[in-house]
C-alpha cells in the first residue's frame, strides 16, 4: 500500500523519498547536502482571541504541511 511498511519520507517531486524515517514527512536529504534550522516563536496575547489562531499553526509545523497519502505520496504536496 505504501513504501517502507507505511513509514514514508517525502522526496522531490512529491514522490516516495529515500529517508523512510516515519510519516513525519521531512524531505529526504543527507546532512552533507543541506542543513535547515527552523525556529518557532510563540507568544501569549492579552486577549484570548489572539491565542486561538496560534494553536492551529503549531499543529501544521509539526507535520511540515505534508501527510502520508496513497502509494506513499504527499497529501497535500507542500513539502519543502
From Swiss-Prot:
Q: So which residues are the signal peptide here?
A: none
Q: Name one GO molecular function term.
A: metal ion binding
Keyword check for Metal-binding, yes or no. Answer: yes
Alphabetized, the UniProt keywords read: Metal-binding, Metal-thiolate cluster
Q: Does the keyword Zinc-finger apply?
A: no
Known function:
Metallothioneins have a high content of cysteine residues that bind various heavy metals.
Into which family does the record put it? Belongs to the metallothionein superfamily. Type 15 family.
Q: What is this protein called?
A: Metallothionein-like protein type 2
> What gene is this protein translated from?
MTI
